[in-house]
Amino acid sequence: MKNDTLKGQYRINEQIRAKEVRIVGDEIEPKVYPIFQALKMAEEKELDLVEISPNAQPPVCRIIDYSKFLYQLKKRQKEQKAKQVKVNVKEIRFGPQTDDHDYNFKLKHARGFLEDGDKVKAYVFFKGRSILFKEQGEVLLLRFANDLEDFAKVDQMPVLEGKRMTIQLSPKKRKCLKNRRLPNR
């Protein structure tokens, strides 16, 4: 299916409508040729005349094996896609009354996520009347951000969204982060 979209992208051989074309390539002197001469040259070499740049005046063409050209394009696109950095957002949930042991456990996991290059979204979930303790939730999230300041920078300060108060952290550039230790509280 993707190959079909690449096929329709370039005009080849008789599909080229211009009267003259500029041919570029390895074994051909780059200059302007009439279309019939360019097609004849491609036919003699048992290759295709492919219109690379249709908007140029005159259009730029190459004499190449079209299927090989499509294969190389597809391969290049696949390599570019593999080089893209995929950012994951990991969520960590707290309650407004989170105990120190639970806090340290979640802090340790957040540190691991940040070292792996993932973003961390920490939130305090308020159930029922616990929304009255939103100041405690904000203090907890600010403490969380402060404890991770060596590993992360704050993208978004604590914000109350419905029954959740969230903070978003993204990893700092890596420079010997693995040797640092978490503060004990």
From Swiss-Prot:
Gene: infC
Similarity remark: Belongs to the IF-3 family.
PANTHER family in the record: TRANSLATION INITIATION FACTOR IF-3, TRANSLATION INITIATION FACTOR IF-3, MITOCHONDRIAL
Regions annotated as coiled coil: none
Name this polypeptide is given: Translation initiation factor IF-3
GO biological process, one term: ribosome disassembly
Pfam families for the chain: IF3_C (PF00707), IF3_N (PF05198)
UniProt keyword Protein biosynthesis, yes or no: yes
Subunit structure and binding partners: Monomer.
Taxonomic source organism: Bacteroides thetaiotaomicron (strain ATCC 29148 / DSM 2079 / JCM 5827 / CCUG 10774 / NCTC 10582 / VPI-5482 / E50)
Keyword set, alphabetical order: Cytoplasm, Initiation factor, Protein biosynthesis
Protein origin, superkingdom: Bacteria
